[in-house]
Amino acid sequence: MSTPVILALTAGEPAGIGPELCLQLATGSRDAGLVVIASGELLRDRASQLGLQIELHDWQPGVAAATRAGHLSVRHVEGCGSTVAGRLDKANSQYVLDTLTIAARGCLNGDFDGMVTAPVHKGVINEAGIVFSGHTEFLQELCGVERVVMMLATEELRVALVTTHLPLKDVSAAITPDRLTQVTRILNADLKAFFGIDQPRILVAGLNPHAGEGGHLGREEIEVIEPTLEQLRAEGIQLTGPLPADTLFTPHWLDNADAVLAMYHDQGLPVLKFQGFGRAVNITLGLPIVRTSVDHGTALDLAGTGKADAGSLHTAIRVGEQMAQCRKATGAGELS
């Protein structure tokens, strides 16, 4: 029997589709208790604009979250000014970050079992004079951890990244033994803790074409990747690779693997997004909390139209719920 969980859901950029995706969820019943972290006025205005009859309930710690259709629990956050769907306003940037802080701290203190994030707009936050490179880095700093790992997943495929948002010219230098070791250990540990996989089987991509072709197409595999993987195998981590990325993503390899570790962003994610865009979930590993997110952006052109697809958000919630249940059931990864 699954363990009941309560998840915080941040509504993201107020001018984007995040608020209406949260409201769309409330039109049906839910298994997980969801608390939307957002401005109550924003949600009421957007519901009115879309013609949705949703009753908002003020939520406080210790109160059960609404799960019935037509009802939505909200932890109201101040600071959101008048918002026009589709029109960014940098004055709302601090409000957006406040929603993330409230959700993360609620996870850390046990009010929530995990958090799910709707998309934010990094550009407008930086235009407000706030240095912000993304959810992942923000939560890493707030939770005080040295390293986090970005993993995207569909029903059929999980892809984690050694490096994330780096120019391609900087990737090789960033793949150090220390980084590769930390990322692999986090991936292995969290596949156990949050996905219930006793002995994760991880495929590791090489950096260069043909995984370096024995050093003829680059020496990173020989000098960095292979020696590091050998040390990690000695720790009991099940690793296959480094493999050429162009053949790694085939059934021959994927059918016997639990996750793929790609060296850089555009090596691993195009395959996953081609396979399951709109059904994928972004997961942050290495945090002391559960955090999942949608695989798309703010979609300003769709905001306020009622045409936004909530498929990825449904997936993010489902995966967040499963991760939180797994953690509760096993006690793995619990905060001390």
Curated annotation (Swiss-Prot):
List the SUPFAM superfamilies hit by this protein, alphabetically: Isocitrate/Isopropylmalate dehydrogenase-like
Which InterPro entries does this chain map to?
Answer: PdxA, PdxA_fam
Q: Does the keyword Zinc apply?
A: yes
Pathway assignment: Cofactor biosynthesis; pyridoxine 5'-phosphate biosynthesis; pyridoxine 5'-phosphate from D-erythrose 4-phosphate: step 4/5
List positions binding a divalent metal cation: 165, 210, 265
Q: Does the keyword Cytoplasm apply?
A: yes
Q: How does it assemble?
A: Homodimer.
NCBIfam families listed in its UniProt record: pdxA (TIGR00557)
What this protein is called in its record is: 4-hydroxythreonine-4-phosphate dehydrogenase
Gene name in the database record: pdxA
